[in-house]
Structure formats: C-alpha cells, structure tokens
Amino acid sequence: MLPWLLLLICALPCEPAGISDVSLKTRPPGGWVMEGDKLVLICSVDRVTGNITYFWYRGALGFQLETKTQPSLTAEFEISDMKQSDADQYYCAANDGHDPIASELVSIHVRVPVSRPVLTFGDSGTQAVLGDLVELHCKALRGSPPIFYQFYHESIILGNSSAPSGGGASFNFSLTAEHSGNFSCEASNGQGAQRSEVVALNLTGLSLVPTENGISHLSLGLTGWLLGCLSPITMALIFCYWLKRKIGRQSEDPVRSPPQTVLQGSTYPKSPDSRQPEPLYENVNVVSGNEVYSLVYHTPQVLEPAAAQHVRTHGVSESFQVSSGLYSKPRINIAHMDYEDAM
C-alpha cells in the first residue's frame, strides 16, 4: 500500500500546471479575404483548466483588438467589413491564470476586386494614320495584383497582357484600315472582371460613326478629305485656264495702236509762190462695224532756198503771213488719237 501512495504523491507535481499551446486560425481559411467580406480570427488552446482569457492583436508590435474570458478551448473575434487597409499580421494569446502564451503570427491578405478600367491610346491619342504603331493602354485604378488584361477591337480579342504587381498594361499593334472602329479592354484578378468604356479610333481623313449594332464604319469624312485635297488643285487649274484664255485673246485682238502711216508722196509745189499745201488722205482699218475712218495730214512745206530768201527779204510780217497760210487748217495729232474710242 505504501508504494502506491508514494507513487501517487510523486505523480501529482508532474502534471502540467496549465495551457501549453495556443494557435490562431482564420475563416475563410488561408488568410485571404475579399474586401467588404467578414474575417473571423479563431484562437485555440490545447486544454482547459478553468476560465481562460483570450487576447487578439494586430501587427508585430501588438496593437490590442479584443479581449474575451470564457471556459472553452476556442474563442472567436470577428471583423465584419474588411478593407484593404486591414491587410496585416495578426496573432492571439491565452492566459489561464498563469503567464499568457501567444500564438504565431498569421498574415491576412485582403483581395480587392478590380475597378472599371480606363482605356487610352498612346502618344497618337484617338487620331492616327494608317501604318502607325498604335499603343493601347488599359489600367484599373484599384485591384489586387496580379491583374490580367484583354484588349478588344469591337468583339474580337486583339491580345492580352498582365500586370503582376498591379497597375496598367499595354498592347501595341500596327494600324490598318480594318482597325477602324471601337476599342475596349477588360481587367480581371480572379475576383470578377470589369470592362472599360468603348473608345473610337479616328483614322486621319476618316470619320468613325457608330451604327445601330455598335459597329463603326467609314462615313462621309473620306469625301470631305478628298474635297479638301482637290479644291486647291481645282482652283489652280481654273486660274491657269483663265490666264491662258486671256493671253490668247490679247494675241488675237485687232491692233490697238495707230497703223504705220505711209504717206502717198508729196504733191506740194516747189515754187515759192505756192502758199497752200495740198492735204494727204489715208484710210484707217475698220475698227467697228462697217465704218471707215480717214485721216487728213497737213505737212508744212519745205521751202526752197529761193523761197527762204524771199522770206528773209520781205521781213518778219510777210513770213508770218506765209506761216499763217501754211497752218491755217487744223492739224491732226496722230500721237494723241485714241483708237479705242472708235470701237
């Protein structure tokens, strides 16, 4: 009997004095939770010897979140609306009246669904020329990485790209006439997909007009572009044609200057006694209609030496009478006759 009593006395101090193991688990499991969803932190102990006080902490520095006391192997702390800023490290501790024992750190990741992406064109903007290398850039302003992007022309997939660390992604292609129309992109990160708004690409000289079924086609912009290019050429041709006709009319026009007068010979008498010179007549070309014009010339008489001597002998008064007789009839100044008035 005594040996059994001694064995019992020695065995009692060898029993554990309290809890020895504390662990933290999450729901949903794995430490991943969607933004806006609920996160449950479950703290567990290996044994219960009475009331146990549970503590929940955030971060390595141990910002205390909650405290509960209950005689159970587990206790739960709930965060009802998780935000992206709630992503951090968490741990718990348990105390059964002795020294508290802490669990290991558990990392919590908050998954953020992608927001609606924005599609933009590169340096060319929404104006481009056939043959250009066009860059499509798609970016979701919010969303947990990695983000997967797909690029569309109308409903046809042009290509795809990914952003392992978040942010946006680009896709390049060489522009052809078949690429006229609407473009869009789609972003997803495993938590749902979002589609961007449709953006129309305008080729230089071509307008893109959406139709009822959403497919764009070439409009009258092509006609406007052609007219814009041909108008200066047409004006230049009209001007050259007008100038050519004007030069042709001038070359075919009747002579506007007075015709060269060919005097029909002088019949003036060489006698000193002849006072009155005989007029000369000349017909002028027909200028207008059936009218014929005549010019009458009076040429001063060239005096013979004897006549000149006669003038010097009889003085100035007689010379004046001779001059008066010679120029008694009006003379026609050919140089001032305007043939244009006759037309």
Swiss-Prot record:
Record note on modification: Phosphorylated on C-terminal region upon BCR ligation leading to recruitment of ABL1.
Alphabetical list of Pfam families matching this protein: ig (PF00047), Ig_3 (PF13927)
Entry's transmembrane regions: 220-240
Disulfide bonds: C138-C185
Consequence the record notes for mutating Y297F: Impaired phosphorylation
Primary localisation category: membrane
InterPro entries reported for this sequence: Ig-like_dom, Ig-like_dom_sf, Ig-like_fold, Ig_sub, Immunoglobulin_dom
Keywords: Cell membrane, Disulfide bond, Glycoprotein, Immunoglobulin domain, Membrane, Phosphoprotein, Receptor, Repeat, Signal, Transmembrane, Transmembrane helix
Positions glycosylated per UniProt: N51, N202
Signal peptide annotation: 1-16
Annotated protein name in UniProt: Fc receptor-like protein 1
Organism of origin: Mus musculus
Lineage of the species this protein comes from: Eukaryota, Metazoa, Chordata, Craniata, Vertebrata
